[in-house]
């Protein structure tokens, strides 16, 4: 049995120079395995989309075959064979899903997708500049080029480009859809994805809440949800070009409307929306046999999430359709819906690029509005909010200045040498800016009025205090803007307890991702690797704020951890980070409460003090941005 380090070394070449032939890289090509029959339908050079039903069908066939390989050597052989003729993007997607879910790949890390496909993250002008620089420098010299801007102030939405086009944010979205494939079939791979539909709802809801906080940080109004399938859309140009076919991602001029495609029509999407809203209002969904499944408090959001995406867990895909996925596809094809011009689709077609487009957030707020219709049907929390005998006395944030968190932009380097064969030994890198924040620590003083120790779950959220016009958000509007910062368990001794927690330890984020070169050097060869590397980038844990100091409400709540505990999460040492958005490997989601609790349901209170219980606390935090 090869070591983890050896497995890592042997897997990495599958992710290098993905558009090139690999016959001379892996040795003698064995005869094509019959299990790969039927693959290769999606041609090489075509942009793969894991939102497209036909693309997903072929990708699923490949990753299921790879997961079921009995040995690691057999797995490598099939990866080797498939790479010769399977579509480049589909291949990387399927192999990545397999690596994340094979038991004998535990401890093996995926190389960053931004190094595998930098053309999905870096403007084509920048890549062109890199290719020019290569000719001007010795082969062993490191080359660094600065990333080019993709717009200017003529477009107000460009103020948010730093966020929408952030490399870490887009990589997170790509990785999340690897961990939770829409076509996952537990009966085939013998593993259940617990609360997968609810995670789909919650992760994307949090993306929308975070995006609105960034808009407010820049003096912009919260986004207007997509709501009319026949309304002209705003324009967007990504300045990206595909490295596998040389053509740019289609841009969308201002004023375009959705058009019917061969695969799906606008009317199909409208019909799906109406049927989903009918189900929510009736309180149940109908399976193909006419049997009714109630959308109850315990499972309703999970059932609904599976239908909306739609995943293989949908109770009736033929009736309810695939609103979310086909929406992405049809929005990416507004300029060439029938393929007559043979254009690339727009960035909305790809999980690694779709967050760049402003319409992504409006589309997902539209999707979230349907989930919220369901949440409105549930009884607002009352006794569930209480944790009797536990009182949160004070909360503060310790940083350079108390209750003030500073943000700024920092430089980082992206190595593109493993995607493009520059014919040189020295690395070629792109320098880019990204938002970051100073490290900070929560200090929470809690009183346990009982005589025994108690196990508590600490839930921390953050939301903007005012809208772009200076009006204070009431609790009803604020709840949908609250972003989760952390969730962890602690033990409360009788009497006063001081809880301290560093921002770097957030349950939402990942600390670091190893580069391709670091993986080559054996930096990440540990059996107990972090499965949930789909976590949010820690640099973007908090919103940008502004130079004057933007006021936010920091919310801390303690709940009974024993009451909320599910399974034995953490016992394996796997996936102890980033569980809020990504769940836990081969385990139940480690929190019995609904995701987003207590802000996932309507709040029936006229003011924040009226809603609060002793185990809950709001305080004011200022986020100041320095250029």
Swiss-Prot record:
Gene3D superfamilies in UniProt: Di-copper center containing domain from catechol oxidase, Hemocyanin, C-terminal domain, Hemocyanin, N-terminal domain
Q: Which GO terms describe its cellular component?
A: extracellular region
**Sorted alphabetically, which Pfam families does this protein's record hold?**
Hemocyanin_C, Hemocyanin_M, Hemocyanin_N
Which residues are listed for Cu cation 1 binding in this entry? 173, 177, 204
Q: Which residues are glycosylated?
A: 312, 316
Q: What InterPro entries does the record tag this protein with?
A: Di-copper_centre_dom_sf, Hemocyanin/hexamerin, Hemocyanin/hexamerin_mid_dom, Hemocyanin_C, Hemocyanin_C_sf, Hemocyanin_N, Hemocyanin_N_sf, Ig_E-set
UniProt keywords, alphabetically: Copper, Disulfide bond, Glycoprotein, Metal-binding, Oxygen transport, Secreted, Transport
Q: List the disulfide bonds.
A: 534-582
One term of GO molecular function: copper ion binding
As annotated in Swiss-Prot or TrEMBL, what is the tissue specificity of this protein? Answer: Hemolymph.
Subcellular location per UniProt equals: Secreted, Extracellular space
Looking up SUPFAM superfamilies in the UniProt record yields: Di-copper centre-containing domain, E set domains, Hemocyanin, N-terminal domain
Which branch of life, at top level?
Eukaryota
Q: Which family is this protein grouped under?
A: Belongs to the tyrosinase family. Hemocyanin subfamily.
Partners and quaternary state?
Tarantula hemocyanin is a 24-chain polymer with seven different chains identified.
Spell out the note in the miscellaneous section: The two copper ions bound each have 3 nitrogen ligands (presumably contributed by His residues) and share a bridging ligand (possibly contributed by a Tyr residue) in addition to binding oxygen.
Report the protein name in the record. Answer: Hemocyanin B chain
**UniProt source species:** Aphonopelma sp.
């Amino acid at each position: 049995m090869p070591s983890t380090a050896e497995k890592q070394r042997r897997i990495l070449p599958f992710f290098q120079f993905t558009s090139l032939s690999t016959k001379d890289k892996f040795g003698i090509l064995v005869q094509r395995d019959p299990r790969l029959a039927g693959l290769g339908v999606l041609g090489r050079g075509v942009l793969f989309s894991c939102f497209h039903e036909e693309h997903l069908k072929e990708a699923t066939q490949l990753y299921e075959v790879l997961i079921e390989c009995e040995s690691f050597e057999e797995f490598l052989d099939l990866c080797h064979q498939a790479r010769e003729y399977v579509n480049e993007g589909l291949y990387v997607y399927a192999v990545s899903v397999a690596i994340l879910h094979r038991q004998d790949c535990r401890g093996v890390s995926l190389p960053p997708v931004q190094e595998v496909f930098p053309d999905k993250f870096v403007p084509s002008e920048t890549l062109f500049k890199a290719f020019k620089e290569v000719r001007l420098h010795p082969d062993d010299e490191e080359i660094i080029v600065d990333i080019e801007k993709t717009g200017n102030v003529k477009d107000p939405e460009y103020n948010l480009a730093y966020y929408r086009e952030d490399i870490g944010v887009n990589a997170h979205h790509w990785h999340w859809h690897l961990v939770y494939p829409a076509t996952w079939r537990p009966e085939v791979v013998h593993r259940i994805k617990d609360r997968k539909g609810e995670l789909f709802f919650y992760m994307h809801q949090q993306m929308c809440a975070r995006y609105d906080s960034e808009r407010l940080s820049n003096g912009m109004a919260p986004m207007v949800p997509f709501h009319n399938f026949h309304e002209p859309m705003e324009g967007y140009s990504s300045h990206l070009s595909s490295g596998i076919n040389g053509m740019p991602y289609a841009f969308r001029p201002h004023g375009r409307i959705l058009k019917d495609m061969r695969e799906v029509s606008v009317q199909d999407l409208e019909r799906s929306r109406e049927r989903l809203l009918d189900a929510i209002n009736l309180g149940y969904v109908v399976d193909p046999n006419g049997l009714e499944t109630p959308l109850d408090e315990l499972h309703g959001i999970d059932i609904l999430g599976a239908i909306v995406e739609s995943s293989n867990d949908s109770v009736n895909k033929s009736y309810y359709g695939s609103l979310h996925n086909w929406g992405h596809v049809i929005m990416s094809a507004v300029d060439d819906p029938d393929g007559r011009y043979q254009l690339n689709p727009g960035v909305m077609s790809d999980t690694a690029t779709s967050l760049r487009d402003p319409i992504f957030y409006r589309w997902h707020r539209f999707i979230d509005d349907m989930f919220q219709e369901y949440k409105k049907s549930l009884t607002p929390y009352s006794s569930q909010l209480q944790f009797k005998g536990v009182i949160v006395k004070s909360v503060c944030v310790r940083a350079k200045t108390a209750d003030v968190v500073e943000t700024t932009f920092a430089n980082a380097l992206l190595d593109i040498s493993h995607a493009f064969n520059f014919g040189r030994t020295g690395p070629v890198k792109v320098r880019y800016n990204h938002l970051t924040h100073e490290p900070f620590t929560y200090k929470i003083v809690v009183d346990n009025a009982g005589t025994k120790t108690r196990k508590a779950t600490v839930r921390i959220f953050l939301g903007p205090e005012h809208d772009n016009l200076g009006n204070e958000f009431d609790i009803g509007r604020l709840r949908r803007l609250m972003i989760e910062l952390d969730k962890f368990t602690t033990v409360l001794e009788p009497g006063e307890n001081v809880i301290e927690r560093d921002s770097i330890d957030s349950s939402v984020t990942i600390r670091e991702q190893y580069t391709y070169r670091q993986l080559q050097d054996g930096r990440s060869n540990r059996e107990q690797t972090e499965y949930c590397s789909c976590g949010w980038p820690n640099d973007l844990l908090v919103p940008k704020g502004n130079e004057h100091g933007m006021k936010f409400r920091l919310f801390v709540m303690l709940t009974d951890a024993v009451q909320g505990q599910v399974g034995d999460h953490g016992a394996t040492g796997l996936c102890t980070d980033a569980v809020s958005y990504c769940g836990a490997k081969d385990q139940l989601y480690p929190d019995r409460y609904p995701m987003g609790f207590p802000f996932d349901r309507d709040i029936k209170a006229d003011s924040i003090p009226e809603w609060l219980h002793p185990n809950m606390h709001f305080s004011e935090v200022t986020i100041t941005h320095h250029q």
